[in-house]
Swiss-Prot record:
Transmembrane segments: none annotated. Keywords: Host-virus interaction. The keyword Thylakoid does not apply. Belongs to the geminiviridae replication enhancer protein family. Pfam families: Gemini_AL3. The keyword Acetylation does not apply. It comes from the Viruses. GO terms for biological process: viral process. Homooligomer. Interacts with the replication-associated protein (REP). Interacts with host proliferating cell nuclear antigen (PCNA). Interacts with host retinoblastoma-related protein 1 (RBR1), and may thereby deregulate the host cell cycle. Oligomerization and interaction with PCNA are necessary for optimal replication enhancement. This is Replication enhancer protein. Increases viral DNA accumulation. Enhances infectivity and symptom expression. It comes from Potato yellow mosaic virus (isolate Venezuela). The lineage of its organism: Viruses, Monodnaviria, Shotokuvirae, Cressdnaviricota, Repensiviricetes.
Length: 132
């Protein structure tokens, strides 16, 4: 859903993509928070993926933040280690695919979190399209 207008994103907008070799560093990865749940073996990583300026311009986006909460049982990985592994798997999937779009980035996150130590993945996105 477009967070500015409240309209649903069409399939055409979600699948609209750009070749990965046309844009340098298309995605920014940021870890917002790492939580250890008390009395459990659960660690929660809050990861944000942002589209860079050139990718947003190619896809006619004003803003694109994809926020994920990854609930894991992996207690050994620190936030920076997990982010590096997560980033590597997302970019590996996109490199193999060759096209970056909103749906392909979400599919790549599904690929990166399809591990035995991941219990849940919660998504919250902030996407705004250009009007003009």
């Amino acid at each position: 859903m477009d967070s500015r207008t409240g309209e649903l994103i069409t399939a055409r907008q979600a699948e609209n993509g750009v070749f990965i070799w046309e844009i340098e560093n298309p995605l920014y990865f940021k870890i917002n928070q790492v939580e250890d749940m008390q009395y459990t073996r659960t660690r929660i990583y809050s990861v944000q993926i942002r589209f860079n300026h050139n990718l947003r311009r190619a896809l006619d986006l004003h803003k694109a933040y994809l926020n994920f909460q990854v609930w894991t049982t992996s207690m050994t990985a620190s936030g920076s280690n997990y982010l590096a592994r997560f980033r590597q798997l997302v970019l590996l999937y996109l490199d193999r695919l060759g096209v970056i779009s909103i749906n392909n980035v979400i599919r790549s996150v599904r690929f990166a979190t399809d591990r035995s130590y991941v219990n849940y993945v919660l998504e919250n996105h902030s996407i705004k399209y250009k009007f003009y």
